[in-house]
Amino acid sequence: MTDSELHNAIRDRFDDEIATGQSVAVLYDNDPNGPPADGSVWCRCSIKRTDTIQVESGPASYRRHGRVYAQLFGPVELGDGDLLDLADEIGSAFEGVSAGGVRYGAVTVRPIGVSGHEYQVNVEIPFTAD
């Protein structure tokens, strides 16, 4: 799987399950749009590759590892409830799932707290793809 195919597979699943499935605005790296101006819950999604290893000798076969980082933001006055619910939905959509040639591992949810005028919760999703 090429890097382009990998990123597209992850973004497609995130769009289907979270952006569309949960009706949440999602911004990806290098997205020219900014956060929603109406104060609604939104997500910044980044895909970071870590290691690539060769899994077979002979014709090249490689396994790519990395993490998807979903930074969830919502108005401070609403607290963390909606963000933690969304983090749970992300966990259900990815944890232990194989889709589009990508295998997702155990999801970690990290409440961050107040960030500017918003409350933040981060979700980390490890992945592997061949």
Regions found by a protein language model. Give the residues of each.
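Oligomerization/assembly interface segments of phage tail-like spikes and tubes
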Residues: 60-77, 119-130
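Small/polar-rich, solvent-exposed N-terminal microdomains that initiate assembly or binding
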Residues: 1-58, 78, 84-89, 97
